[in-house]
Amino acid sequence: MRSFQRVCDAVAFSHSQGVIHRDLKPGNILVTGRGVPKVIDFGVAKATSMELTERSFCTETGQLIGTPEYMSPEQADLGGTDIDTRSDVYALGVILYELLCEQLPYNVKQKALHEAIRVIQEDRPDRPSTITRVIRGDIETITLKAIEKQRDRRYDSAASFGRDIKRYLDS
């Protein structure tokens, strides 16, 4: 969990530099021999100062940019160009959910793209406490807040998400 809090700090730093990662997932987090997590693969990242267009989200063949399993509802919207740093917060929340529950909040890997988008945008994840009884209380609340469908109900930043993780760990 301390490593996860450090990942939140790293993402918060990239946000402070005006960069949205857009493809946060476990495969894009490396841990050094000293246990320091490093966020990698900023290949689809966007500067917050750049105007986002439909081409920023799709390839020539209409495929989404990013990994659907970790994608926020607003990023999954094929016509949506209005993403901000809370999209990365959502992806961090999915990573935390997966760490705690040993499964993703949604199973979209084998679904057709339109069905995966519907699940991401409409379905509610199972509460972590229904999957793993030891996960309840504050950590469950923190996790579910990070993966809220409505971004205005999520943490407003990776920094505030990381602070809540730190408070939880220190309590």
Can you annotate each of these PLM segments?
Residues 1:
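Conserved HATPase_c
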Residues 4-12, 16, 20, 24-32, ...:
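C-terminal lobe helix-coil module of Hanks-type protein kinase domains
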Residues 37, 53-65:
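Regulatory activation segment
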Residues 42-57:
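Activation segment/activation loop of eukaryotic-type protein kinase catalytic domains
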